[in-house]
From Swiss-Prot:
Cysteines engaged in disulfide bonds, as pairs: none
Gene Ontology terms describing biological process: ribosomal large subunit assembly; translation
Protein name from the UniProt record: Large ribosomal subunit protein bL20
GO molecular function, one term: rRNA binding
Function: Binds directly to 23S ribosomal RNA and is necessary for the in vitro assembly process of the 50S ribosomal subunit. It is not involved in the protein synthesizing functions of that subunit.
InterPro entries reported in the protein's UniProt record: Ribosomal_bL20, RIBOSOMAL_L20_CS, Ribosomal_protein_bL20_C
Organism of derivation: Ehrlichia chaffeensis (strain ATCC CRL-10679 / Arkansas)
GO annotations of cellular component type: ribonucleoprotein complex; ribosome
SUPFAM superfamilies from the UniProt entry: Ribosomal protein L20
DNA repair is among the record's keywords: no
Length: 124
């Protein structure tokens, strides 16, 4: 059986790690063993923060909607409840964008929700 020399595969594996470590400081960018540790940790951070980004943006949208809704005399919880009463199917991302960039359209939605809330209170 022929002898297997692993230099080619080792070189390819090392190149892959060094390529991922591009831009790092010190020996982290060109010393394989150190670069491997840094790259593994960076990939762990990336995996974690892809999930955290979703949480962060949802909370940011809620804060923006809450601030805009309070300017019109409503609470966030009442606003969200009114959305379902008025059959408005806009998500928080779109509502937050409207609250920041299209204030007149957002005010129309708030007025629509206020009417829906008043109708539900009268019906009770």
């Amino acid at each position: 059986m022929a002898r297997v020399k692993r230099g080619v595969t080792t070189r390819a594996r090392h190149k892959k790690v060094i390529k991922l470590a591009k831009g790092y400081r010190g020996r982290s960018k060109n010393c394989y063993r150190i670069a491997l540790q840094r790259v593994e940790k960076a990939l762990q951070y990336a995996y974690r923060d892809r999930r955290n980004r979703k949480r962060f943006f949802r909370s940011l949208w809620i804060m923006r909607i809450n601030a805009a809704v309070r300017q019109h005399g409503l609470l966030y919880s009442d606003f969200i409840h009114g959305l379902s009463l008025a059959n408005v199917t806009l998500n928080r991302k779109v509502l937050a964008d409207m609250a920041v960039n299209h204030k007149d359209h957002f005010k129309q939605i708030v007025d629509l929700i206020k009417e829906a809330l008043n109708k539900s209170r009268v019906a009770q």
